[in-house]
């Protein structure tokens, strides 16, 4: 349970409109490849079981893991990848539109294979495409993608929506049927049964919630508050850990 500052009126983090809950991206949705946080821009296969890139990086082929499923049980297929790219390219956020427009051609030789021909000159484009969120075509094709929504969207990630209370709090629940739970990249992760975010109007309100035990996790970015603001928590079951972040 974590206290955040702000509010939200949408659970779709892929569009320009509205104020979304950004955590939806990593908890509910997934990408073809998965990033390794302790290696510089290093990706490993996830929804894509294999990836094949030509020498000058102007073509890439992704092979979808046949075990990959959305949380409603529907299998992930090549058509979902094509739908995701075209939808985000045409209606997504500016970064999606910029990068995905560099895909000259996309084709599906079979239901698990996606081949893309790319504009030359961008050697990172293959990696960026690998981080593209995969959307379920059968859910989104009947919706107006560019409109904000508080509906409990379907993804393939380790968590699903439990409770959505606009502007107040949101709760995610671990999916016991998560398709990748036994894969090596998921071991030791996604250990919480529920994850809750409560929203406060200002930083002080969020801080007071933490001090009262209404929030169990807090990321402190204010040096002065870190130095003196936690003094009255001494003796309580609170662990303070300083992490050096290199930029």
Predicted features along the sequence, with ranges:
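Short, well-ordered beta-strand elements
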Residues: 1-6, 49, 59-62, 81-84, ...
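N-terminal lobe/hinge region of extracytoplasmic solute-binding protein
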Residues: 3-55, 86, 154
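Extracytoplasmic
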Residues: 27, 46-48, 55-59, 76, ...
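Sec-exported extracytoplasmic/periplasmic mature domains
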Residues: 33-37, 56, 69, 81, ...
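Gly/Pro-rich hinge or "lid" segments in bacterial periplasmic/extracellular proteins
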Residues: 36-38, 130-194, 204-205
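Aromatic- and charge-enriched surface segment that lines or borders ligand/interaction sites
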Residues: 49-94, 109, 115-117, 200, ...
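Extracellular/periplasmic solute-recognition and catalytic clefts
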Residues: 105-106, 162-173, 198-247
């Amino acid at each position: 349970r974590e206290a955040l500052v702000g509010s939200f009126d949408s659970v779709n983090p892929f569009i320009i409109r509205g104020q979304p809950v950004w955590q939806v991206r990593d908890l509910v949705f997934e990408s073809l490849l998965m990033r390794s946080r302790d290696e510089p821009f290093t990706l490993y296969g996830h929804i894509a079981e294999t990836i094949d890139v030509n020498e000058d990086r102007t073509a890439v082929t992704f092979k979808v893991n046949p075990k990959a499923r959305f949380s409603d049980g529907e299998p992930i297929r090549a058509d979902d990848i094509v739908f995701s790219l075209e939808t985000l390219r045409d209606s997504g956020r500016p970064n999606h539109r910029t990068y995905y427009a560099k895909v000259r051609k996309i084709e599906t030789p079979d239901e698990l294979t996606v081949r893309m021909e790319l504009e030359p000159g961008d050697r990172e484009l293959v990696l960026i495409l690998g981080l593209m969120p995969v959307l379920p075509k059968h859910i989104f094709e009947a919706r107006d993608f560019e409109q904000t929504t508080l509906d409990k969207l379907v993804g393939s990630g380790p968590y699903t929506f439990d409770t959505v209370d606009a502007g107040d709090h949101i709760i995610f629940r671990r999916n016991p049927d998560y398709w990748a739970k036994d894969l090596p990249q998921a071991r030791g992760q996604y250990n919480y049964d529920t994850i809750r975010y409560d929203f406060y109007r200002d930083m002080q309100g969020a801080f007071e919630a933490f001090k009262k035990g209404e929030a169990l996790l807090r990321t402190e970015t204010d040096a002065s508050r870190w130095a003196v603001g936690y003094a009255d928590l001494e003796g309580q079951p609170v662990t303070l850990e300083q992490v050096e972040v290199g930029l």
